[in-house]
Amino acid sequence: MSNAREIRSKVQSVKNTQKITGAMELVAASKMRGAIVKMNNVRPYVESANTIIKNVTAASIDYPNPYLFDRDVKRVGYIVISTDRGLCGGLNINLFKHVLKEIKNNIEDRVGVDVCVIGSKAENFFAKLKDVNIVATAHYNDKDKEGSIRAIGGAVKVMLDKFTAGEIDRLYMSSNQFVSTIKQRPRLQTLLPIQDIFSAEEIKANKEKATKGHWDYIYERDIEEVLNALFIRYIEAQVRGAILENAACEQAARMMAMKNATDNASDIIDQLKLDYNKVRQAMITQELAEICSGAAAV
């Protein structure tokens, strides 16, 4: 058993660490509230983009746009959104396990995989995989929002260009979904082809509504130009919304991780204090025994 001085040193060390984790918990809680506000602010825009896309797709259901229709799958693309920093529990690793399962299924089916990674954690993880080709990387930085948006837009454009050129036949996005402060779960959603976001019933209903003239759009300039721009904006809106939601997940996960660390530090301190008291009791007992032995000898 350690001596009393060593135990006191350990207690002080754990207390110092506890102060740091407690402060990080408060900072993460503050940042989480701001991230949730941003996430909620962008949701109406993303939902409106979804509605517009559904209506326009229904009105132009037979228009030969490469973003719309299925084709034989020989290669797929993934946009994986992670964090740039750690200390957020299992948030990133759970996401990577989820998307890696899908990637392995594709590889087993002899389907090639291209990945666009957003966040340094995803970049470091997928760089170690031999069968995965990283074609674009980007990072989101609150201190340089405009630069981050341009970088992310450029990375997304790489994937869109590859889809348009026929180099990939499906495009998916993997990110974390904010369920609550204490629960976040990985999510994989289809971005392209756009028809894949509709069920068979929705496609049938959209065709019927388009035939009956529910949506009758007049396009200025060329319909191809308008639809291409609209579809690109739609994909960008989906990605930006997912990035903001992932940021809220990151801060919530970090807050809970730091709270657990702070609570665990309290348990460790209690155990160390118990050990310290045992050591002191043993020392006192030994001293008393020595005094009694000396008195008996006299």
Curated annotation (Swiss-Prot):
Organism in which the protein naturally occurs: Francisella tularensis subsp. tularensis (strain SCHU S4 / Schu 4)
Alphabetic keyword roster: ATP synthesis, Cell inner membrane, Cell membrane, CF(1), Hydrogen ion transport, Ion transport, Membrane, Transport
Biological role stated in the UniProt entry: Produces ATP from ADP in the presence of a proton gradient across the membrane. The gamma chain is believed to be important in regulating ATPase activity and the flow of protons through the CF(0) complex.
One GO biological process term: proton motive force-driven plasma membrane ATP synthesis
Membership in a protein family: Belongs to the ATPase gamma chain family.
Gene Ontology MF terms in the entry: ATP binding; proton-transporting ATP synthase activity, rotational mechanism
Assembly mode: F-type ATPases have 2 components, CF(1) - the catalytic core - and CF(0) - the membrane proton channel. CF(1) has five subunits: alpha(3), beta(3), gamma(1), delta(1), epsilon(1). CF(0) has three main subunits: a, b and c.
Main location: membrane
GO cellular component, one term: proton-transporting ATP synthase complex
Alphabetized NCBIfam families for the sequence: ATPsyn_F1gamma, PRK13422.1
Designated name of the protein: ATP synthase gamma chain
Membrane-protein topology: Peripheral membrane protein
